[in-house]
Design a protein with these regions (language model features):
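Charged DNA-binding/catalytic regions of mobile-element recombinases
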Residues: 1-158
């Protein structure tokens, strides 16, 4: 059975927790946050940023982590009129696009660097997500970058 890659980022003294809001169609990372706690606050901040900067989705899919089932998180989605979808418990394949981003991030960035602290991890991950969105082509997108594919879709939809 496939196992989730977990969005835990190793640092010299412990772990940081990563959340990313990803557009499934284009694979574009719309917003992300890194935190030293699993509280829902950093997830809510990433969600609010994505909703402020990009068109509202019809459906929002997450796993059943406590930060995503928290009232603080789900109330933002409900307040925006977004349908909440959650993966089956322990079914990482239900959220395959997010799992793929975690795998790419870990093998192309995180495992290649030893972050001393949260600031260093945040800088490295920020550079990687810029690369991922703007430079790294995806076979499933016809070898376009997520950003180019997203913007192409947005242009034709307008």
């Amino acid at each position: 059975m496939p196992r989730p890659t977990h969005p835990y980022i190793p640092m010299a003294h412990g772990f940081a927790y990563l959340v990313a809001i990803i557009d499934w169609y284009s694979r574009r990372v719309l917003a992300w946050r890194l935190s030293n706690t699993m509280e829902s606050t950093f997830c809510v901040e990433a969600l609010q940023e994505a909703l402020a900067r990009f068109p509202k989705p019809t459906i929002f899919n997450t796993d059943q982590g406590s930060q995503f089932t928290a009232e603080a998180f789900t109330s933002v989605l409900r307040g925006a009129g977004i349908t909440i979808s959650m993966d089956g418990r322990g079914r990482c394949i239900d959220n395959v696009f997010v799992e793929r981003v975690w795998r790419s991030l870990k093998y192309e960035e995180v495992f290649l660097h030893a972050y001393e602290d949260l600031d260093e991890a945040r800088a490295g991950i920020g550079r990687y997500f810029d690369f991922y969105n703007l430079v790294r082509p995806h076979q499933a997108l016809g070898y376009q970058t997520p950003d180019a594919f997203y913007r192409g879709v947005a242009l034709t939809a307008a």
